[in-house]
């Protein structure tokens, strides 16, 4: 499955300036997803991080990973964000290996590595030009509203 920005807007509860995915290039519901974030100099966070050396904050890279995890789960035809809420319970083993700067295309890959009835653990990677920029494990709980 692939999703354009209009699909993502319908699937996620986020909106500008906190919607951090531009498209999903591959998705197997409840298994994996690959998403793209086009990093531009117009991002509001670059105003202060850092004015003379713009770098995407690591916490926003992790947030982009979390949004890709949400797409992975919400792309299941039985789910939608109006009926379910996903709570992120933990971020573990986060590592930031390469700065992400304006002009970069951030490719985010998420894989479900463990799933129980109402929780999922994801292994997440963010790459720029195939070089690993960051990685983390995210644990999420899925609750019906």
Curated annotation (Swiss-Prot):
Keywords linked to the UniProt accession: Cytoplasm, Lipid A biosynthesis, Lipid biosynthesis, Lipid metabolism, Lyase
Catalytic residues identified in the record: 49
One GO BP annotation of this record: fatty acid biosynthetic process
GO-annotated molecular function: (3R)-hydroxyacyl-[acyl-carrier-protein] dehydratase activity
Main localization, broad class: cytoplasm
InterPro entries tied to this protein: FabA_FabZ, FabZ, HotDog_dom_sf
Record flagged with keyword Metal-binding: no
The EC number(s) this enzyme carries: 4.2.1.59
Enzyme class, broadest EC rank: lyase
Subcellular location: Cytoplasm
Coiled coil regions in record: none
One GO cellular component term: membrane
Reactions this protein catalyses: a (3R)-hydroxyacyl-[ACP] = a (2E)-enoyl-[ACP] + H2O
Protein family according to the UniProt entry: Belongs to the thioester dehydratase family. FabZ subfamily.
Role: Involved in unsaturated fatty acids biosynthesis. Catalyzes the dehydration of short chain beta-hydroxyacyl-ACPs and long chain saturated and unsaturated beta-hydroxyacyl-ACPs.
Protein name: 3-hydroxyacyl-[acyl-carrier-protein] dehydratase FabZ
Gene that this polypeptide is encoded by: fabZ
